[in-house]
């Protein structure tokens, strides 16, 4: 049944029906045997390949172990590369995963980064067909690592789940790459003079802790820092504008250190504060003007409205301050809220002034009427005497009386004549006459105009200047 067998048959066999069937069966059996032999050969080849694939890692693993043992033999991880010869150059790179949130109360922000450092260590050179050794974090403690620390960090956490998020690569020429993932709470001193229209540059500073610049030199591996998609960052009140990196030297008692800094430029979004503070303050001021259209004799209505608006402004001022640290200077929001409070308080004082002077005038009119009624009947008239109407006789009144009446207005008497009697006489000279009854009419024009001018100057000054 092998493939080398030869079958001889005569034409007479073809005419025999029985022998013809046997011949066909024989040919089919021969073909099936050839297929089985080929399948066995292919299985043998696959088995050989599988055996090679299984054995290859064992040989490779042994080579790596041998390389690592030879590199670490006599290696002192307490000494930096090229010590006593030249400074060790550290190339740094940062990939920003996310920024936020920013805490204005504690003046700090949170940032999640992948921090990479690259340097050359001639003690780690090796000769092998492998160009790079890809190692895990277990090898980190066995070689020299730069003592880089973040200078403005308040709290830093390395990620350990599910394993330490650290990476180590060693090239055959001695180049070492070390990366790790960090979450840092860094200081960011906010200047809140223009709050909530402020912009800030939050720094992230790092340098060597113990090696001055003549021992370690830091350099940026790339001219710019890479960042992830900012739309997933938890900045909330802030918008990410951009970033920039810089290098500077810090002069200290222990030496001169190279400081690497990344500045994250942020601008505050005004939407929250517009809804929570600015619009309520404006509406409260406008509401206080309603009292100018209420009858001046409606004392309870105008008084309650004025007091309510003043208390509302006090509450808004307190709420606006809760989202800020207790700074000693005036912010833009403080200025706006304070001016709104002044307008509301002035509206209340306007009615107090109006009510005071109108009440005095009513009392004076009542006294005059009583006096006239008493003098209208004279008990000592003789028969035949002529009766002269008293209303045609002007009562003697000196200029001191005018002065006394004007002085009742206290400071008002210095520049204004606050009573109708001040229209004439020497007290009228050099003074502006104000009709008390029309103070509400004046206020309806003055208060809205003054508030509109203030808003114009305020918003143009803080947004465009």
From Swiss-Prot:
Membrane topology term: Multi-pass membrane protein
Alphabetical keyword list: Cell membrane, Chloride, Chloride channel, Disulfide bond, Glycoprotein, Ion channel, Ion transport, Lipoprotein, Membrane, Palmitate, Postsynaptic cell membrane, Signal, Synapse, Transmembrane, Transmembrane helix, Transport
Transmembrane segments: 274-294, 301-320, 329-349, 445-465
One term of GO molecular function: GABA receptor binding
Keyword Transport attached: yes
Glycan-bearing residues: 50, 127, 245
Signal peptide location: 1-20
Catalyses which reaction(s): chloride(in) = chloride(out)
Primary site of residence: membrane
Disulfide bond entries: 188-202
A GO cellular component entry from the record: postsynaptic membrane
Tissue expression summary: Expressed in brain.
Biological processes per GO annotation: chemical synaptic transmission; chloride transmembrane transport; gamma-aminobutyric acid signaling pathway; inhibitory synapse assembly; synaptic transmission, GABAergic
PROSITE patterns: NEUROTR_ION_CHANNEL
Extracellular topological intervals: 21-273, 321-328
Subunit structure: Heteropentamer, formed by a combination of alpha (GABRA1-6), beta (GABRB1-3), gamma (GABRG1-3), delta (GABRD), epsilon (GABRE), rho (GABRR1-3), pi (GABRP) and theta (GABRQ) chains, each subunit exhibiting distinct physiological and pharmacological properties.
Annotated NCBIfam families: LIC
Function per UniProt: Gamma subunit of the heteropentameric ligand-gated chloride channel gated by gamma-aminobutyric acid (GABA), a major inhibitory neurotransmitter in the brain. GABA-gated chloride channels, also named GABA(A) receptors (GABAAR), consist of five subunits arranged around a central pore and contain GABA active binding site(s) located at the alpha and beta subunit interface(s). When activated by GABA, GABAARs selectively allow the flow of chloride anions across the cell membrane down their electrochemical gradient.
Protein name listed in UniProt: Gamma-aminobutyric acid receptor subunit gamma-1
Organism annotation: Rattus norvegicus (Rat)
